[in-house]
Amino acid sequence: MSSPRDRVNAFYKDNLQFKNTRVVLNKEQLLIERPYMLLAVLFVMFLSLVGLLAIAGIRLHRAAVNTAEINSGLTTSIDITKSIEYQVKDVLTPLFKIIGDEVGLRTPQRFTDLTKFISDKIKFLNPDKEYDFRDINWCISPPERIKINYDQYCAHTAAEELITMLVNSSLAGTSVLPTSLVNLGRSCTGSTTTKGQFSNMSLALSGIYSGRGYNISSMITITEKGMYGSTYLVGKHNQGARRPSTAWQRDYRVFEVGIIRELGLGTPVFHMTNYLELPRQPELEICMLALGEFKLAALCLADNSVALHYGGLRDDHKIRFVKLGVWPSPADSDTLATLSAVDPTLDGLYITTHRGIIAAGKAVWVVPVTRTDDQRKMGQCRREACREKPPPFCNSTDWEPLEAGRIPAYGILTIRLGLADKLKLTIISEFGPLITHDSGMDLYTPLDGNEYWLTIPPLQNSALGTVNTLVLEPSLKISPNILTLPIRSGGGDCYTPTYLSDLADDDVKLSSNLVILPSRNLQYVSATYDTSRVEHAIVYYIYSAGRLSSYYYPVKLPIKGDPVSLQIGCFPWGLKLWCHHFCSVIDSGTRKQVTHTGAVGIEITCNSR
């Protein structure tokens, strides 16, 4: 039997004993197992952190995208709101205010002043006080053997003086600058940049007709020293007709004149101040315009070719003469003009679209004429010009005098605009550089001297335009300036236009008239209807004498088709060159004739190196 001590020891043998017991730890095993556990815990924490960061990044990205979309929408809304506010506040409101002031305040006041001025001047016939008659001396002491209608003459004189005063005050606020101040790149030694600004803002009558959908055609617009003048045919249809079968259209010949103004829009605006609208008649088919001295003058005929004889025109040929002041006055007229005795050598004149000038109380135009002595004086010149590689005009059938073998000369048409002058049209003529087509002749006044610039437009894909000089006093002389070729064997002064090679640019469908800019150095502009681009365009070319290259700027058109006519007019305004165009096109889709008009401001800047 075991002893009690053995039983106690047996009870505690398999139990932990803390007293007097030594525990031996396996340190190597602990050192190996503990890092694995820590790494496992850290890896789990790292994965959790990465997951949280990924979730946070996705949410932040979504929030940023939503915020960007909201900001973009707000920015667009703000821009649209600002644009509308600008249009209403800075453009439309001042424009309507200006129009309202002009129509409601200034124009009636000017007419009131005009009426009062005329009444005061007429009272001199029975004066009740002292008058200063120095400005109308003819009303007091007319020259001998001159019979005038005192009432009419003095009223018209007073009206013209007031018109001059009103126009000068109106033009005083405009920003017309000489072209010499317009940067046309003359001082650039490197490359240049050409920029354009399009504008169709207008206070002209033609703009109102276009807005109403009336058909405008045969439009000619010319500018001169802050004024503009134009003429065109307009077809007015009955807009109140309920059925097309009951609609009708009436055609009118319209003449309008006005001033070019700055209305706070940054662009020049044609502001019509006077107009005349006449029912379309045979003698109003073809018209020539002249502008100057605050007047517009026009000569109109039924046909572009008129046979002449020593006594003047035949009875069936009528010349319609129209004169309009920049402001309406009793001196405005619409009447028939008579042709004074004609030089016996003249037998025909040919009229197209011609630009004339008004200077020294006379309106002057230049047109082609035929003379009976053409073969004797210019026959050798023509034969030599057509001998080797004859240009197209040698066998041309497109123009009546060339088809008949005639050699046209230059005819100067002059009509005096004085109130005491009879409306008689005089013609003098002289030969000069050969005239090879009937695209028109335009006359421009130089800044100094007594020479005039005479331009002949280019002939599309055939001949370049020419710039000649014309001297009226002491004797008529037409001399070549640029773009002509001398014929050495032609004898004397024999020149022809510069004809192009057969490799012409087929993308150029039509050329415009040549416009001389008012500068001391010869500068001129022409335009072409170009189809080389996806959108058809009018391409303006700016030339300066002495430069081998030109500047150009294309104006995209909203229409496409076959061009019928292209007429331009250019003038300096501010630091830009503004050109107005009227283009007629046979639409390629509808095959109907459509028109496009507008103005573009061209600015040429030098690129810094």
Curated annotation (Swiss-Prot):
Q: Where in the cell is it found?
A: Virion membrane; Host membrane
Q: Where does the sequence pass through the membrane?
A: 35-58
Please provide the record's keywords in A-Z order. Glycoprotein, Hemagglutinin, Host membrane, Host-virus interaction, Membrane, Signal-anchor, Transmembrane, Transmembrane helix, Viral attachment to host cell, Viral envelope protein, Virion, Virus entry into host cell
Q: How does it sit in the membrane?
A: Single-pass type II membrane protein
Q: List, alphabetically, the InterPro entries matched.
A: Hemagglutn/HN (IPR000665), Sialidase_sf (IPR036278)
| Keyword field contains Acetylation | no
Gene Ontology CC annotation, any one: virion membrane
**Pfam families per the UniProt record, alphabetical:** HN (PF00423)
Question: Which molecular function terms from Gene Ontology are attached?
Answer: host cell surface receptor binding
* Residues modified by glycosylation: N168, N200, N215, N395
| Highest taxon of the lineage | Viruses
Q: Which residues lie on this side of the membrane: Virion surface?
A: 59-609
Q: Does the keyword Transmembrane apply?
A: yes
Topological domains (Intravirion): residue ranges?
A: 1-34
Tell me a GO biological process for this protein: symbiont entry into host cell
The family classification in the record reads:
Belongs to the paramyxoviruses hemagglutinin-neuraminidase family. Non-sialidase subfamily.
> What is its biological role?
Attaches the virus to cell receptors and thereby initiating infection. Binding of H protein to the receptor induces a conformational change that allows the F protein to trigger virion/cell membranes fusion. Down-regulates human MCP/CD46 cell surface expression.
Q: What is this protein called?
A: Hemagglutinin glycoprotein
